[in-house]
């Protein structure tokens, strides 16, 4: 019995030990944040740079026009490389994404509101929530507080501001233009063509196809360059990440594994590598232990930070994340005037147009320059009417769309735009509707009466003509019977002697009855 009790006690102790190890294993999953690669001295409480804030004006930057849409083209290409840099083997990933306006996003740590909450999260956690196909760590942040540094615009939401401090920026404007370089606060806040995605890095690596590191060092931080720390940040080998675009306007993400001062690459080597990949503009993002690459929600890189158990390496909880996802509509809700289908807005209504369903189009005539195009059609100016506002108001009406009747004396017409009564147009006065109706009825009845009278007279004339003709024919027939044809036969005596009257008639006398 004692033996079984002892065995049970040992079993319980073993189980307790297993659970303790398991809990310890969970604790060991947290990064120690020990591979730090900072561009500026850690002891100095400062924002990303000490240089003067630029509130207004145009700063040096490059704008690349949005690439044309290529239906059916592959949206994402991820290449894995192992390259040698001065006899050092370096592994990493190069990602290209077409149509960055619809396939790329800057994400706050852990989702929307992460910067305001000063939240930190691993790239995996943030990427899974946003369905990222490829994700990397993004901009710089304060290790002790989690504060997002620099400018951050995430899906059109401005969540962090640098206040005009001049660090390298990469962003996408609403029309798809890719912007790389230095921006004033005024340019960041532009509302005519605002940024939909924007984040800050440190060091402009490549500008318009040329390495720009020296110029960037002088521009971004004069004072810290003297301390040597910024120079070390540029030249030390470490894990690195970058973002930019190529000549086709495709988004390019770069990631290289490493550990500060032990393995990896420096900024010069990274810039040269990117140039060989036809990258035109690129900036450097957070590196060192922050460098993380996640593919389809799974960690695909080798972190340099140690876990709580030094035997293992763990991904660091970082701030912003750059994400490549399936094509999305821009904006996702199509401005409330359409439905997003396969990354393209299908606009509702008859007049909403444009990639984001935010443009009103009332046809080629554009309301004939006499009205305003609205979501229900043309809203005509005063004095005009019709579906495209091409018709002037009829007499007696005025105002927008000719919806108001004139109120002039004697029903005179008014100005079709203002409704003012015009004395010079008295001759064009209109009759009252009742008078017009009575006149119309009278005219109608008069025409009907005249038509009936004309038909009656014609009928009587026809009857009279027929009667006269019948009477004439009847009289002719009677005369023919009374004075019909006959032959004259002279009378003779029975003895063959002529009558005495015939004898007495002279030979030259004319006999009217003789042929």
Curated annotation (Swiss-Prot):
- Provide the protein name: N-acetylglucosamine-1-phosphodiester alpha-N-acetylglucosaminidase
Give the residue ranges of motif NPF internalization motif: 511-515
Q: Which stretches of this protein does UniProt put in the Lumenal compartment?
A: 50-448
Please give the InterPro entries that the UniProt record associates with this protein.
EGF-like_dom, NAGPA
Reported impact of residue 51 to M? 65% of wild-type of activity
Q: What is the effect of changing residue 322 to A?
A: 67% of wild-type of activity
Q: What is the lineage of its organism?
A: Eukaryota, Metazoa, Chordata, Craniata, Vertebrata
Glycosylated at which positions? 208, 214, 296, 366, 388, 420
Which of the seven top EC classes does this enzyme belong to?
A: hydrolase
PROSITE patterns given in the database record: EGF_1, EGF_2, EGF_3
Role:
Catalyzes the second step in the formation of the mannose 6-phosphate targeting signal on lysosomal enzyme oligosaccharides by removing GlcNAc residues from GlcNAc-alpha-P-mannose moieties, which are formed in the first step. Also hydrolyzes UDP-GlcNAc, a sugar donor for Golgi N-acetylglucosaminyltransferases.
Q: Name where it's found.
A: Golgi apparatus, Golgi stack membrane; Golgi apparatus, trans-Golgi network
Q: Kindly state the subunit structure of this protein.
A: Homotetramer arranged as two disulfide-linked homodimers. Interacts with AP4M1.
Gene designation = NAGPA
Tell me what disease the record lists for it. Defects in NAGPA have been suggested to play a role in susceptibility to persistent stuttering. Stuttering is a common speech disorder characterized by repetitions, prolongations, and interruptions in the flow of speech.
Mind telling me which PANTHER family this protein's record contains? N-ACETYLGLUCOSAMINE-1-PHOSPHODIESTER ALPHA-N-ACETYLGLUCOSAMINIDASE
């Amino acid at each position: 019995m004692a033996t079984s009790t002892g065995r049970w006690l040992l079993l319980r102790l073993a189980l307790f030990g297993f659970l303790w190890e398991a809990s310890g294993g969970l604790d060991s999953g947290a990064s120690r944040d020990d591979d730090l690669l900072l561009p500026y001295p850690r002891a100095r409480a400062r924002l990303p740079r000490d240089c003067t804030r630029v509130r207004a004006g145009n700063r040096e930057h490059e704008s690349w026009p949005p690439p044309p849409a290529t239906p059916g083209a592959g949206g994402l290409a991820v290449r894995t490389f192992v390259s040698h840099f001065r006899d050092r083997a370096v592994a990493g990933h190069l990602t290209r994404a077409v149509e960055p306006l619809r396939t790329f996003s800057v994400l706050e740590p852990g989702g929307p509101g992460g910067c305001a909450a000063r939240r930190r999260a691993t790239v995996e956690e943030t990427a899974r929530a946003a369905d990222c196909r490829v994700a990397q760590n993004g901009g710089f942040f304060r290790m002790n507080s989690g504060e997002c540094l620099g400018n951050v615009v995430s899906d059109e939401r401005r969540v962090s501001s640098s206040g005009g401090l001049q660090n390298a920026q990469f962003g996408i404007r609403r029309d798809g233009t890719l912007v790389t370089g230095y921006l004033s606060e005024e340019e960041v806040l532009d509302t005519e063509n605002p940024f939909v995605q924007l984040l800050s890095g440190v060091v402009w690596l490549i500008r318009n196809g040329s390495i720009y590191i020296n110029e960037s060092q002088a521009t971004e931080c004069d004072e810290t360059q003297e301390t040597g720390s910024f120079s070390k940040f540029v030249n030390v080998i470490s894990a690195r990440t970058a973002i930019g675009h190529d000549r086709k306007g495709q988004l390019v993400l770069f990631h290289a594994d490493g550990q500060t001062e032990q393995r990896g690459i420096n900024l010069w080597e990274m810039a040269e590598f990117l140039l060989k990949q036809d990258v035109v503009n690129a900036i450097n993002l957070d590196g060192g232990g922050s460098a993380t690459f996640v593919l389809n929600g799974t960690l695909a890189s080798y972190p340099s930070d140690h876990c709580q158990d030094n035997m293992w390496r763990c991904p660091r909880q970082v701030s912003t994340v750059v994400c490549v996802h399936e094509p999305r509509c821009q904006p996702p809700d199509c401005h409330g005037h359409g439905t997003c289908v396969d990354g393209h807005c299908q606009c509702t209504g008859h007049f909403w147009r444009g990639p984001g369903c935010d443009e009103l189009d009332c046809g080629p005539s554009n309301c004939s320059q006499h009205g305003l195009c609205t979501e229900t059609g043309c809203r005509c100016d005063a004095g005009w009417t019709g579906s495209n506002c091409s018709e002037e108001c009829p007499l007696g009406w005025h105002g927008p769309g000719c919806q108001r009747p004139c109120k002039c004396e004697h029903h005179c017409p008014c100005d079709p735009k203002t409704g003012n009564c015009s004395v010079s147009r008295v001759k064009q006065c209109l009759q009252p509707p009742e008078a017009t109706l009575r006149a119309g009825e009278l005219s109608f009845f008069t025409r009907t009466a005249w038509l009936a009278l004309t038909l009656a007279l014609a009928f009587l004339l026809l009857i009279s003509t027929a009667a006269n003709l019948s009477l004439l024919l009847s009289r002719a027939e009677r005369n023919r019977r009374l004075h019909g044809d006959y032959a004259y036969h002279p009378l003779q005596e029975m003895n063959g002697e002529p009558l005495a009257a015939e004898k007495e008639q002279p030979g030259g006398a004319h006999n009217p009855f003789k042929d």
